[in-house]
Curated annotation (Swiss-Prot):
Gene3D superfamilies: Uracil-DNA glycosylase-like domain
Family per record: Belongs to the uracil-DNA glycosylase (UDG) superfamily. UNG family.
UniProt record, GO biological process: base-excision repair, AP site formation via deaminated base removal
Protein source organism: Borrelia recurrentis (strain A1)
Official protein name in the record: Uracil-DNA glycosylase
Keyword field contains Cell wall biogenesis/degradation: no
Enzyme class: hydrolase
Length: 223
């Protein structure tokens, strides 16, 4: 079936788009947007924003989230990211705090992480849509099957990618990744409830930049 997505991703995922579960997923999502109007996030054109912003071969880092923000106007299709006119959520505030601590730089007070994506950071939510005010409302419609395949495809076809797995949900994806050719960094989730259990002080961003340098890759400006 035809899916509007960046061309290199379309090639990598074409067999996935033809599977029964994905066709059922698309049918469900279309009906959700039709019947619930503006209460499904992100807007339809941004569902695959993480893919459209970053061609497959340019991935250097994967940061895995769970599902989109469920408040109006927040989600923009990139994990942990919000639109630039939206107040920075607590988890992202802690991410910026850890960057400033470990890299000794001042982050830009803007929650739109498109600037990271354009440099090679794949900001992937495991579940790509959500209903307003109902976190994890779309967790069982097929998105996890799809994004698990995405992770496996990245692991198989690319080399020396950094995977940042924050929290138990993300850590559960470790089994999908070839640890012999990629760097996996694990710690607690940056949420205020768990950031002090390892995330703050993890040095994930400095470790990432060092790994990219060691493998002769252009580093990422995480400001």
């Amino acid at each position: 079936m035809e899916v509007k997505i960046e061309e290199s991703w379309k090639e990598m995922l074409k067999s996935e788009f033809c599977k029964g579960y994905f066709k059922r997923l698309v049918s469900f999502i279309k009906n959700e947007y039709k019947t619930k109007k503006d209460k499904i996030f992100p807007p339809p054109r941004l569902i695959f924003n993480a893919f459209d912003t970053l061609p497959f071969k340019d991935i250097k880092v994967v940061i895995l989230g769970q599902d989109p923000y469920h408040g109006k106007g927040q989600a923009n299709g990139l994990a942990f990211s919000v639109n630039s006119d939206i107040k920075i959520p607590p988890s992202l505030q802690n991410i910026f705090k850890e960057i400033e601590r470990s890299l000794k730089i001042k982050t830009i007070p803007n929650g739109d992480l498109t600037r990271w994506a354009e440099q090679g950071t794949f900001l992937l939510n495991s579940i790509l849509t959500v209903e307003e005010g109902r976190p994890s409302s779309h967790k069982d419609i097929g998105w996890k099957i799809f994004t698990n395949e995405v992770i496996k495809i990245i692991s198989k076809n690319l080399n020396n990618v950094v995977f940042m797995l924050w929290g138990n949900f993300a850590k559960g994806k470790k089994k999908l990744i070839d640890t012999s050719k990629h760097l996996i960094l694990e710690t607690s989730h940056p949420s205020p409830y768990s950031a002090h259990n390892g995330f703050l002080g993890s040095n994930h961003f400095s470790k990432t930049l060092r790994y990219l340098q060691e493998h002769n890759k252009t580093t990422i400006n995480f400001q």
